[in-house]
Amino acid sequence: MVHSQLPVAASLRLLCALLLLPSATMIPGGLSPRSVTDPDVREAAEFAVQEYNALSANAYYYKQLRIVEAQSQVVAGAKYYLTMELMKTKCAKTTGKPKVYKEIQNCELPPKAQQEKLTCRFQVWSRPWLKKTELTKMSCN
């Protein structure tokens, strides 16, 4: 009795093709790397910096130096996982009129010997159809 090898060969080719697919396409809701220059990532980063400054007890604003890494996850909306570097500025916080992101980014930095840099990890949850964005997690050191 002769058995055809065609179904086995076709199955092996299919298996190899599936293994070559990026892992994010195989796991619904999984994390996917994102470019730090992606407009959605930049918007989430701006929101994170604004919220960090609103929530922190620091007397001075911190501005974004750079986005180190970005990932996203499709949930009910999009969740952005950001690693960012922030730097303390010379702009003091004043009660009643908080600065917006663009104003903070224009703040001067202190002299090099007095500079304080933070590495922060933020999770930003965006649901545009509800016009709602939330900072769901924040840690800086």
From Swiss-Prot:
Gene Ontology CC annotations of this record: extracellular exosome
Motif mapping: Secondary area of contact: 73-77
Tissue specificity annotation: Expressed by the venom gland at an extremely low level (at protein level).
Cross-referenced Gene3D superfamilies: 3.10.450.10
Gene Ontology molecular functions: cysteine-type endopeptidase inhibitor activity
Taxonomic superkingdom: Eukaryota
Signal peptide: 1-26
Coiled-coil ranges (or none): none
Main localization of the protein described in the UniProt heading: secreted
Pfam families documented for this protein: Cystatin
Site location (Reactive site): G29
Localization per Swiss-Prot or TrEMBL: Secreted
PROSITE patterns linked to this entry: CYSTATIN (PS00287)
Domain Cystatin: 29-129
Disulphide connectivity of cysteines: C91-C107, C120-C140
Keywords noted in UniProt: Disulfide bond, Protease inhibitor, Secreted, Signal, Thiol protease inhibitor
Keyword DNA damage: no
PANTHER family per UniProt: CYSTATIN-M
Role according to the record: Inhibits various C1 cysteine proteases including cathepsin L, papain and cathepsin B. This protein has no toxic activity and its function in the venom is unknown. It may play a role as a housekeeping or regulatory protein.
Note: Negative results: the recombinant protein does not inhibit calpain-1 (CAPN1), a C2 family cysteine protease and legumain (LGMN), a C13 family cysteine protease. Does not provoke cell death (PC3 prostate cancer cells).
Family membership noted in the UniProt record: Belongs to the cystatin family.
This protein's name: Cystatin
